[in-house]
């Protein structure tokens, strides 16, 4: 890109060149460059590539250097510098046959112009020219060489051949350079075809890398599928879901209701059967897919890699193409060729012209001068040097370079043929196999694994139902608890409002009484009425009653309005928001479906109890455990019901984590219980079944705090004193001492520490749940692939094979865990303690944060009153307590880490030992499998060989018997034929003996007729000689006519030529007449000496090749007529049947074509003449106008006759005196300088050194009293001042310097009009 053209700074231009992107054609190896910033979209980029390589945009497939599919974002971000272009038409997966392959190669290499630069013969390689040059060399030694001794046409031909030879050499060198045969890359000379071969191989390496990426994606998907299957098999409930179901049968709720009745056992059995079938199906598909991957993908990928390496060695490591000596020799060859061509061009420029070769010694003499003879000798010497030395070297070097170019091109085409016929088909085949396998994994296998996972999720409800049902109970209990908390808060609010109303009413009564007593004028009981306003009892009551709002909080749940201290039960709206029995849900899903419902609580406790009483365990399952029944039953749940459910879980040995989680939920609700160490008696944590609803009740306190905080306004903050609340609730428990203040940085440290402990607890819990699934690669699948298909009938057996290696590792882990069960239990106890401590710390942290806010506000209000020392002491004490707690937690954390590290090290060591043992077994099994496979392949090959040998021997035996039978039959037929022929011959012999006499008589008659025929043949021979001579004359005249016609046509700029391919029925025999520009200028003069009609001199001067072709057919006419009959027959049969017919076709002139061509040419000439005549007339008019315009302008230099000149008088007095003294002499030389009427000379105003002085003959111009004269020059006479006469007035009238030139000008004054 030209930076100046686009207005770019040189630095910007260099940056653009650095950001250029190379685009390579993967089949042809052609490279183009582009700037990424020139493209606004991906489609525009593809259009550019399509226009550059001739590939449709829909057929483009683009890759980057490492086989990554090109994206437009890569181009815009400058992340890619190389793009490889693939044509989808050649990568369709179908193997090309020979015809299609040849067509494809022809279309790919149609841009190769190698045939156009093939070296042609030199113009000097002509036998006639060589003979003439030899003749010239001999005659130049003559003393008096005459022009009559030279053939001027041939001499001109020699001169022209030398000049055309220089053009031939220069064109040859230019063609080789234009093909970019060599170019410098990193200071190394490389062949373009080698670079193209490298590009082709690198492009297909990128395609192989793309295939490898596809395989890695397939490998990842396959491994994920295997891992998913193994994980599902490890965690599957397929074998032990019934044990969990039996546990559910022992878990009861409210004493009579069994938890297993919520599940459909028959549906669970169907799901388990479906899972078993799916597991076997997935296992079989993975096994078959592994076999297909090994046979169709992995082995072929190895083969493709080997094939690519072989192509690199074959086409890149070619000794003749890539050796350094070859590169240096080629460079030397090109330099040597350049030197020889420059020498030929230089010699051609120094050649004499034809006139210099034909210069005579005198005017009328024909003898050549010595200089001409010398130049002829130089011409002969140059011709011999070129023809014998330089031209053969140029031909040899150019042929060498051309052959190397052809060799490299053939190597490239061979690579293209190999790729298109075999390599590309194999690469695309592997890609198709990868796509099929990927689709199988993503569609079929993924769907089956998803179904299997979904079935496992269905069966997991058997294991998770105790926790799910417990959470459902906790959620409902929380709603009941919240309703009670809300009722209490509402009741307290009503009391407060009523109290405020009572206080206001009492205050009004007191105030109105006092007001009436202190103002007697308004008291109606005091004497006379002064004011119109008098206060009586009715008015007092009205004053107290007016504007006293009656407020009451009424809880509305549906259509029921409970009293403030009403029942603690809840009620439900008559119509639920959702359908209680969705048809697509089973019993447990119905339960889970109702988790998100919103219920309205009311006074339906009695109705619920009736429902519970009416449904006994003996009732049918569908009626007893309907959705509405369970919802109504759970509405009546109490804390004791929840604890009985937990006790039932413990009795049936349900997982301790489930129990701990449920107990934690109760604790969060403030419904936790404590156990006495003596007899484990259950004690309620407060009055009532759902909590004490006092300061010890966390949920109640949270709701109360939120309620009170909502009454805060600007500049008003509400502080909650827990001891005050406890006193109001009548609770006499001791106040728990709380820290007054907590440092902010210390709280942040606690938060970070708690998060770290939570992370450690989570990791330990994961470790206790078992080792993570092992990411099994291909070797395990190879192991179970070798087993017979008979062992794959059931899913259990298939699963055992697929998990062979992993099962042993898992068994070892289980054994190790059983050995360390004591340590794990101790660790678990420590973890539970730490978890409880962490929970307690979290709660304390929340309380501390709230207390901090409260105390901070108190400190702000009491800042002026409080003592600073007491505040600091309180902060220090709180900080000290927190530090003690932090040290205890750190100590516990260190103990936990040490136990965890010891346990991890022991487990890790045992697993590594087991893995090493398994690896050795795998290697051993793999080696055994390989040996058995090799032995099997060897036996198969041997069996195939002997089977083939047997089949070939049987076939040969059968063919031999058939041939013997056929030959025996032939022999019998031939014998019968020979016997019959012998009998026929005997009959013929007898007949011939009878005919012998007749033949003797016929012979005598034949001899007499033969004598007569000889005389006739002599007469016929003379006639043939005469006809042959006349025929030769006609042919020569015909040939002359053809030459004349070609000369006439070329004289008018037309060239007659013949098409190489023409139809047989073409009347003109393929002859065409074309107009050729510049042909007339090359046409030699027709007045030169004419050559013989059948000679080659005239033919060489013609541009038409038809005359030369016709002349080749006239060779046999130069011979004398043959005399012998055999020779005559040969001439008649061969010459006249072939050459003569060809000659007649070549010399036949189509009259219509000739007349039309000449007529059209003359019409064109006439039209051109008219056009030129118009242009000439227009130019003449313009010239006349310009002449008139020029004639009216004053000339100031280079004067000539007819110019209009301005004359001015001179001011040199010496010139005037000289003119006065020499006036007499001047008058005497009137031819040189005319007389003057005044002694003052006048000179023309001019620019330049020459002096132009006015010569006024006989006062032709009146100069008296005039300052200037405008006159037109009539004549000028040049004078020069010599050194001898510059001091004489006559020789130097104007007193000029020696050697000065001056002009005497005669002019006529220009007048107006």
Curated annotation (Swiss-Prot):
Q: Name one GO molecular function term.
A: protein kinase binding
Q: Which Pfam families match?
A: ATG11
What is the protein's membrane topology class? Peripheral membrane protein
Gene Ontology CC: one annotated term: vacuolar membrane
Keywords of the record, alphabetical order, are: Autophagy, Coiled coil, Membrane, Protein transport, Transport, Vacuole
Give the GO biological process terms: autophagosome assembly; autophagy of mitochondrion; piecemeal microautophagy of the nucleus; protein transport; reticulophagy; ribophagy
In its keyword annotation, does this UniProt entry include Transport?
Answer: yes
Keyword check for Transport = yes
Where does it localize?
Vacuole membrane
Q: List the disulfide bonds.
A: none
Family to which this protein belongs: Belongs to the ATG11 family.
What functional role does this protein have? Involved in cytoplasm to vacuole transport (Cvt), pexophagy, mitophagy and nucleophagy. Recruits mitochondria for their selective degradation via autophagy (mitophagy) during starvation. Works as scaffold proteins that recruit ATG proteins to the pre-autophagosome (PAS), the site of vesicle/autophagosome formation. Required for the Cvt vesicles completion. Involved in glucose-induced micropexophagy.
Q: Give the protein's recorded name.
A: Autophagy-related protein 11
The beginning of the lineage is: Eukaryota, Fungi, Dikarya, Ascomycota, Saccharomycotina
């Amino acid at each position: 890109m030209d930076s100046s053209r686009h207005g770019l700074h040189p630095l910007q231009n260099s940056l653009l060149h650095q950001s250029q992107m190379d685009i390579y054609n993967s089949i042809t190896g052609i490279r183009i460059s582009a700037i990424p910033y020139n493209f606004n979209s991906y489609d525009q980029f593809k259009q550019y590539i399509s226009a550059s390589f001739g590939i449709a945009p829909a057929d483009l497939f683009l890759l980057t250097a490492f086989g990554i599919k090109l994206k437009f974002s890569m181009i815009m971000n400058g992340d890619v510098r190389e793009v490889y272009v693939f044509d989808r038409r050649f990568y369709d997966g179908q193997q090309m046959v020979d015809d299609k392959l040849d067509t494809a190669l022809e279309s790919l290499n149609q841009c190769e112009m190698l045939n156009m630069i093939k070296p042609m013969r030199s113009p000097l390689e002509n036998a006639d020219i060589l003979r003439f040059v030899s003749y010239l060399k001999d005659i130049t030694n003559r003393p008096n060489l005459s022009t009559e001794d030279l053939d001027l046409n041939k001499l001109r031909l020699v001169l022209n051949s030398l000049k055309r030879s220089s053009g031939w050499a220069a064109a040859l060198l230019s063609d080789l350079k234009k093909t970019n045969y060599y170019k410098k890359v990193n200071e190394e000379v490389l062949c373009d075809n080698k670079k193209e071969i490298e590009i082709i191989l690198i492009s297909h390496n990128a395609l192989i890398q793309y295939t490898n990426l596809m395989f890695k994606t397939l490998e990842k998907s396959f491994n994920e599928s295997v891992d998913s299957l193994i994980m599902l098999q490890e965690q599957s409930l397929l074998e032990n879901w019934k044990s969990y179901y039996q546990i559910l049968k022992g878990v009861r709720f409210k004493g009579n209701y069994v938890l297993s009745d919520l599940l459909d056992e028959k549906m669970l059995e169907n799901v388990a059967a479906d899972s078993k079938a799916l597991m076997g199906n997935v296992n079989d598909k993975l096994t078959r897919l592994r076999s297909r991957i090994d046979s169709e993908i992995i082995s072929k990928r190895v083969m493709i890699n080997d094939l690519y390496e072989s192509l690199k060695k074959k086409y890149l490591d070619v000794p003749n193409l890539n050796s350094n000596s070859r590169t240096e020799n080629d460079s030397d060859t090109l330099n040597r060729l350049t030197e020889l061509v420059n020498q030929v061009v230089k010699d051609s420029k120094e050649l004499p012209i034809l006139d210099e070769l034909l210069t005579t010694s005198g005017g009328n003499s024909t003898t050549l001068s010595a200089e001409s003879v010398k130049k002829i000798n130089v011409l002969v010497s140059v011709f011999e040097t070129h023809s014998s030395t330089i031209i053969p070297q140029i031909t040899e070097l150019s042929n060498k370079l051309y052959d190397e170019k052809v060799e490299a091109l053939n190597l490239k085409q061979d690579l293209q043929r190999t790729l298109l016929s075999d390599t590309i088909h194999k690469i695309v085949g592997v890609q198709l196999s990868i796509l099929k396998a990927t689709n199988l994994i993503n569609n079929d296998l993924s769907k089956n694994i998803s179904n299997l996972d979904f079935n496992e999720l269905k069966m997991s409800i058997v294991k998770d139902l105790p926790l799910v049902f417990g959470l459902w109970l906790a959620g409902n209990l929380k709603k009941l608890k919240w309703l009670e908390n809300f009722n209490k808060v509402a009741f307290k609010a009503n009391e407060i409002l009523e109290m405020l109303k009572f206080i206001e009413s009492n205050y009004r009564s007191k105030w109105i009484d006092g007001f009436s007593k202190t103002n007697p004028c308004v008291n109606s009981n005091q004497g006379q009425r002064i004011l119109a306003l008098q206060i009586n009892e009715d008015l007092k009551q009205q004053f107290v009653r007016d504007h006293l709002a009656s407020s009451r909080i009424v809880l509305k749940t549906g259509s029921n309005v409970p009293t403030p201290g009403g029942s603690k039960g809840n009620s439900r709206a008559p119509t639920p928001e959702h359908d209680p029995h969705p048809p697509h849900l089973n019993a447990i899903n119905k339960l889970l479906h109702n988790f998100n419902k919103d219920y309205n609580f009311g006074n339906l406790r009695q109705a619920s109890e009736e429902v519970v009483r009416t449904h006994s365990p003996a009732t049918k399952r569908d009626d007893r455990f309907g959705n509405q029944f369970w919802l109504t039953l759970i509405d009546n749940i109490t804390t004791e019901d929840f604890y009985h459910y937990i006790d039932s879980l413990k009795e049936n040995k349900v997982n301790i984590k489930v129990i701990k989680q449920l107990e934690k939920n109760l604790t969060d609700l403030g419904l936790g219980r404590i156990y006495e160490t003596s007899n484990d008696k259950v004690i309620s944590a407060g009055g009532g079944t759902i909590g004490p609803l006092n300061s010890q009740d966390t949920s109640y306190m949270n709701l109360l705090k939120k309620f009170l905080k909502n009454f805060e306004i600007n500049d008003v903050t509400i502080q909650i004193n827990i001891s005050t609340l406890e006193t109001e609730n009548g609770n006499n428990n001791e106040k728990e001492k709380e820290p007054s203040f907590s440092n902010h940085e210390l709280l942040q440290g606690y938060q970070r520490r708690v998060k770290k402990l939570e992370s450690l607890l989570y990791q330990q819990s994961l470790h206790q749940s078992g080792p993570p699934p092992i990411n099994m690669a291909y070797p395990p699948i190879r192991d179970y692939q070798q087993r017979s298909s008979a062992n794959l009938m059931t899913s259990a057996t298939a699963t055992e094979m697929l998990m062979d290696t992993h099962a042993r590792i898992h068994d070892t882990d289980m054994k190790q865990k059983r050995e360390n069960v004591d340590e794990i239990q101790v660790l678990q106890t420590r973890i539970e303690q730490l978890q409880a401590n962490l929970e307690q710390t979290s709660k304390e942290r929340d309380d501390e944060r709230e207390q901090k806010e409260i105390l901070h506000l108190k400190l702000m209000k009491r800042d002026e009153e409080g003592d600073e020392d007491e505040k600091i002491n309180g902060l220090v004490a709180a900080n000290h307590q927190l530090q003690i707690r932090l040290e205890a937690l750190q100590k516990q954390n260190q103990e936990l880490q040490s136990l965890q590290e010891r346990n991890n090290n022991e487990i890790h060591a045992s697993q590594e030992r087991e893995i090493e043992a398994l690896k050795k077994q795998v290697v051993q099994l793999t080696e055994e499998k390989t040996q058995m496979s090799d032995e099997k392949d060897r036996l198969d090959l041997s069996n195939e060989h002997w089977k083939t040998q047997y089949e070939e021997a049987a076939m040969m035996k059968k063919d031999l018997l058939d041939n013997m039978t056929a030959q025996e039959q032939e022999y019998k037929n031939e014998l019968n034929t020979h016997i019959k022929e012998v009998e026929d011959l005997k009959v013929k012999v007898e007949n011939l003996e009878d005919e012998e006499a007749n033949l003797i008589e016929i012979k005598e008659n034949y001899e007499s007729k033969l004598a007569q025929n000889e005389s006739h043949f002599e007469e016929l021979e003379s006639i043939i000689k005469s006809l042959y001579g006349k025929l030769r004359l006609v042919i020569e005249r015909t040939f002359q006519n053809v030459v004349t016609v070609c000369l006439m046509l070329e004289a008018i700029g037309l060239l007659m030529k013949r098409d190489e391919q023409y139809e047989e029925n073409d009347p003109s025999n393929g002859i065409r007449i074309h107009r050729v520009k510049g042909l007339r200028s090359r046409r030699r003069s027709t007045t030169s000496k004419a050559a013989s009609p059948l000679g080659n001199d005239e033919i060489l001067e013609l541009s038409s090749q038809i005359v030369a072709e016709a002349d080749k057919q006239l060779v046999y006419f130069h011979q004398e007529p043959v005399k012998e009959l055999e020779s005559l027959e040969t001439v008649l049969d061969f010459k006249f049947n072939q050459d003569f017919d060809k000659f007649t076709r070549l010399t036949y002139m189509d009259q219509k074509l000739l007349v039309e061509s000449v007529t059209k040419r003359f019409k064109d000439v006439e039209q051109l003449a008219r056009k030129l005549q118009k242009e000439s007339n227009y130019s003449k008019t313009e010239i006349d106008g310009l002449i008139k315009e020029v004639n009216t302008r004053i000339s100031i230099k280079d004067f000539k006759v007819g110019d209009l000149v301005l004359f001015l008088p001179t001011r040199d007095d010496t010139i005037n005196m000289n003119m006065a003294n020499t006036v007499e002499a001047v008058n005497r030389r009137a031819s040189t300088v005319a007389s003057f009427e005044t002694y003052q000379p006048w000179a023309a105003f001019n620019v330049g050194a020459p002096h132009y002085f006015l010569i006024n003959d006989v006062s032709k111009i009146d100069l008296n009293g005039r300052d200037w004269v405008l006159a037109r020059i009539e004549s000028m006479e040049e004078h020069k001042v010599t050194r001898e006469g510059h001091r004489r007035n006559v020789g130097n009238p104007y007193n000029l310097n020696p050697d000065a030139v001056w002009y005497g000008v005669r002019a006529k004054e220009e007048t107006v009009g």
